[in-house]
Amino acid sequence: MDSIIGRSQFVSETANLFTDEKTATARAKVVDWCNELVIASPSTKCELLAKVQETVLGSCAELAEEFLESVLSLAHDSNMEVRKQVVAFVEQVCKVKVELLPHVINVVSMLLRDNSAQVIKRVIQACGSIYKNGLQYLCSLMEPGDSAEQAWNILSLIKAQILDMIDNENDGIRTNAIKFLEGVVVLQSFADEDSLKRDGDFSLADVPDHCTLFRREKLQEEGNNILDILLQFHGTTHISSVNLIACTSSLCTIAKMRPIFMGAVVEAFKQLNANLPPTLTDSQVSSVRKSLKMQLQTLLKNRGAFEFASTIRGMLVDLGSSTNEIQKLIPKMDKQEMARRQKRILENAAQSLAKRARLACEQQDQQQREMELDTEELERQKQKSTRVNEKFLAEHFRNPETVVTLVLEFLPSLPTEVPQKFLQEYTPIREMSIQQQVTNISRFFGEQLSEKRLGPGAATFSREPPMRVKKVQAIESTLTAMEVDEDAVQKLSEEEFQRKEEATKKLRETMERAKGEQTVIEKMKERAKTLKLQEITKPLPRNLKEKFLTDAVRRILNSERQCIKGGVSSKRRKLVTVIAATFPDNVRYGIMEFILEDIKQRIDLAFSWLFEEYSLLQGFTRHTYVKTENRPDHAYNELLNKLIFGIGERCDHKDKIILIRRVYLEAPILPEVSIGHLVQLSLDDEFSQHGLELIKDLAVLRPPRKNRFVRVLLNFSVHERLDLRDLAQAHLVSLYHVHKILPARIDEFALEWLKFIEQESPPAAVFSQDFGRPTEEPDWREDTTKVCFGLAFTLLPYKPEVYLQQICQVFVSTSAELKRTILRSLDIPIKKMGVESPTLLQLIEDCPKGMETLVIRIIYILTERVPSPHEELVRRVRDLYQNKVKDVRVMIPVLSGLTRSELISVLPKLIKLNPAVVKEVFNRLLGIGAEFAHQTMAMTPTDILVALHTIDTSVCDIKAIVKATSLCLAERDLYTQEVLMAVLQQLVEVTPLPTLMMRTTIQSLTLYPRLANFVMNLLQRLIIKQVWRQKVIWEGFLKTVQRLKPQSMPILLHLPPAQLVDALQQCPDLRPALSEYAESMQDEPMNGSGITQQVLDIISGKSVDVFVTDESGGYISAEHIKKEAPDPSEISVISTVPVLTSLVPLPVPPPIGSDLNQPLPPGED
């Protein structure tokens, strides 16, 4: 095994196998993610792109080229975040696989022109590393191809684009552009011994000499130019504080990385410290000075700043640094190093002086050089102009119409005689084609146009005549001054004299000509006379001037379409605005009428006029020269009111809503008259909803006038009209709960009106024309009461700790009629508060004196249409019933939350209540009606009916139980035949038998006759239980037998003789049927189950002595009947119906005697 593993080939193949498997897994994942990118949301796309980047570029870089196009296609995505994620992917690609630069660089250039500033900033950030990696990659290529050359061209284009962005409007883009240019300057310059060293640094020293794409010198020159631009930008007066701090930091980094630029940077910092931009605020100045101090401290630590240490120290002292702090920053150097640097400083200074002197000499030489006209260049320009003019003319001379027109145009201008020059230069045309003639004529005219510098060829001439340095031939003269020929000296003297004479002559002529011109000018001044318009014109009549004015304004107004087509509609609107605001009333009213003719399309013009009036009112713009006796705000108020009235009268409903809303929301100020008009508009049925909504929005959007608009809504919240009241209260809730606008004022108003109810009669403050109740009323009406507490009830769910307490106080002190009104209005606010409101639960638990009815009503509301009441509510109600309120009605709302034992214990008290309340109770218990159908009880209908029968009659009147059972049996949908069978089956098992059992049996038999056989069996079981011992049940037994005859006759024969005698005595009508049945039985032979002679005698009516040994006669007295022990626990219920008094039970008659010694009926032994 070791030998196998030791083989390198095997290890290599195994590694390749695992690598291939890893790549395949990664490829499958990336394919799935790329498929999801098509339909994913923007946020999901960003997550998927991050996963692709992590997988492809993090662990499987060989997949980068395969999925590159899929990712780059998202560069056109509409979402900004997705495009930024693509930029991050491209940046990482250029770090991991820089050879893919030609494939991605076009996308970078495209995204640099994106519409989103965020994307542009992200691209600029990425371009820093992309440019560095790309430059290193291109330098490493031995033979760069076309793709590499194209990539370098695009990189250069990107560099130029970012350089232009240093003047971008966006502050963040400028900051990122500065940081990018910082990197470019560092990359395109040489490092020296003092440069700050970093990992992966790149400088011009790394650019190979054989690189064909770019040269060191060119890159260095470009880097120097970019540094100059940064220095210039750093010194501008309009630079922002953010850009200034960023530029300062970048220049400091450049100086640290390339100390060769240290002098320029220190000089820039010195200028900045002396002259901070005037646009900065005090806090910005402090930030800039703090940043400058920090950058200077950083520079001072660098060895390359040794030459400028004194300058930096001076600036740091000025910026607040102490001498000790500065001394700690200076790097430590030995004496040799300091001497070497001092020597280098002197050498640099000497070189600088020599260079400066050399430049001064060159400049002086250039100034001393004489210039002359460059005739060769001038001739070359003339020839080029002639060719251009000749070509132009030849194209036009080919058209006969042009030639004819030209001849006819200039024919009258020909001289009478042929000029001599024409005769000298003219050559007759012999045997030339038309093309040759056109060429010849075009050349001739072209030369003339060039002489005059006319035609299209005039563009070839330079603006100034071409000049060149005058060439002076060097004449070597070895003659000394003594050897100069006298004739030559005399000749030179004569030439110089003639030259001076000519110059004097020209000067004299010029002075004479100037003197003549001055004389002419003075004579012209003498003849000139000032022209006065008033002396040569007459004033127009006033009416005519006004007519001209109105006609001119009307023409301006009617030129609307022409101005729109010409693109000057904004200038026309400005002109009309100024005219309307500054001209007399007749012009103003005319413009107003023009606007109102089509207010929907001309509303912008109206707003321009409105704002112009506002500017005049506030003194922001020119003042009108029209004299008026009105108040300063009259023009503005009049215009605004006319706009509002015009919109209301001339627009349809839809446009009226939109335009009125715009006017009120966009008007600079709203006078009281306009607010009053809005109040009147809100009283209109069609506009009331939109008007109140507008008032609410004005309260939110116009904080200075919020008190006024809230007061308007408060007035509407107590208006007589219900629709206005509801809308106003809803908007006040929004201001109160959502926007938190004047909550204290709203609380004060609501509580003030709530307390009006405590008074015996409505106060005068309730009645006003503003509230829709102009006439006072002596007594409270239900509507007036609801108006007073309506706002308080609306705000109750949002501040229950305040309003619930006040409502309780008012409820206690008010009259019974007003209490009923309050109870009927509690539903909506209590339901909004909910059963979990701690304030409500605390009120139920405390239940102050006099608040019982209110608390009961609250419990009813909280339990409406709820399957099962809240446990906390049930607990509070149970405690309330046990400790404070001993009225069982308090338990009614929470019946569905009680246990079975609690229901059984409280049932006797419930059925003794008012019939209406008892009906409601059984509707709840049985789930009758839509209101209670969803409730779930702990007892079934069967249990309820059985519980009613087992109620102790000493605790509850028998009549109440009878009524309760009747209510149950009336619900045939619930108490079906099967349910009643179950009830009777349970009742027959009860000991002693329930008093109303036989009554229920008879009612069940009446409802469902098919129960006859079941009842027969039931009667037999009753005989076994000696039914005759309970008189009421015995009577019911006999009535049941009567109903079931003749089928029930066998039941009578099972009775003991004494009870049979009693039955026949109480029900004589049974005797014939029984006799008939007995005779039918006599035909059968006697057997053990036959009819005895004693029974036959009883049936026939013969006298038979029947002995009864029990003195009770077989009946059990009421006091000896076994009773169920009552449950001591009681549960409370709430109702607004009064309780009926309990009925007094009827006395029980004495029992009838019976013989206990009689033999048992057949089958009982």
Swiss-Prot record:
Lineage: Eukaryota, Metazoa, Ecdysozoa, Arthropoda, Hexapoda
Chain positions covered by the region annotation Disordered: 365-384
One GO CC term on file: nucleus
One Gene Ontology term from the biological process aspect of the record: co-transcriptional mRNA 3'-end processing, cleavage and polyadenylation pathway
GO terms for MF: RNA binding
Subunit relationships: Interacts with Cpsf73 and Cpsf100 forming a core cleavage factor required for both polyadenylated and histone mRNA processing. Interacts with Slbp and Lsm11.
Organism: Drosophila melanogaster (Fruit fly)
Residue ranges, compositional bias (Basic and acidic residues): 367-384
Transmembrane domains' residue ranges: none
Pfam families linked: SYMPK_PTA1_N, Symplekin_C
This protein's name: Symplekin
Similarity-based family: Belongs to the Symplekin family.
Localization: Nucleus
Role summary: Component of a protein complex required for cotranscriptional processing of 3'-ends of polyadenylated and histone pre-mRNA. Involved in germline stem cell transit amplification, differentiation and mitosis-to-meiosis transition.
InterPro entries per record: ARM-like, ARM-type_fold, Symplekin/Pta1, Symplekin/Pta1_N, Symplekin_C
Keywords associated with the record: Coiled coil, mRNA processing, Nucleus, Repeat, RNA-binding
Repeat region (HEAT), residues: 23-58, 61-95, 98-140, 147-186, 218-257
